A protein has these predicted regions:
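Macrodomain-like recognition of ADP-ribose-binding/processing modules
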Residues: 1-132
Length: 132
């Protein structure tokens, strides 16, 4: 994981330049690549849910250790890495409904889902609804 504290953000969601840069801290943590494992090392596929569970806890722990009360999380590898949205959502939900329940003031999930089925979005909505 990489913590990049107090980085200036120069543009808004539409790509327009902000009048004044906003400061934000970023935690970079790679998602396991289910697709690569399936194609090249299928013996490792059963390890992925535990890796997701453990890494998601590390991300939350690092955020809390640095006093971040508001966090934005993503659909960790549910696109090109082909991670199962239900597994990823449950990895985060297990912590946010358990040990980390009520520890953050605000948690947002940025979930890009342009499919007609909205399977990825629905998986996160279903898993995290109880954490709201």
């Amino acid at each position: 994981m990489i913590l990049s504290p107090e980085c200036p953000v120069f543009r808004n969601d539409d790509g327009k330049l902000l009048l004044k840069p906003q400061m934000a801290s970023f935690i970079t943590s790679p998602a396991p690549n289910y697709g690569a494992a399936a194609d090249n090392r299928s013996i490792e596929l059963p390890l992925i849910p535990k890796v997701l569970h453990d890494r998601s806890e590390l991300v939350l722990s690092l955020a809390m250790a640095h006093g971040y009360s508001q966090i934005i999380l993503g659909a960790w590898g549910c696109g090109v890495f082909r991670n199962d949205p239900n597994v990823v959502a449950m990895a985060f939900a297990s912590h946010l409904l358990g040990r980390w329940s009520g520890r953050f003031r605000r948690i947002l999930f940025s979930v890009l889902d342009s499919s007609t089925s909205k399977e990825t979005f629905t998986a996160f909505q279903r898993a995290l609804r109880r954490a709201a």
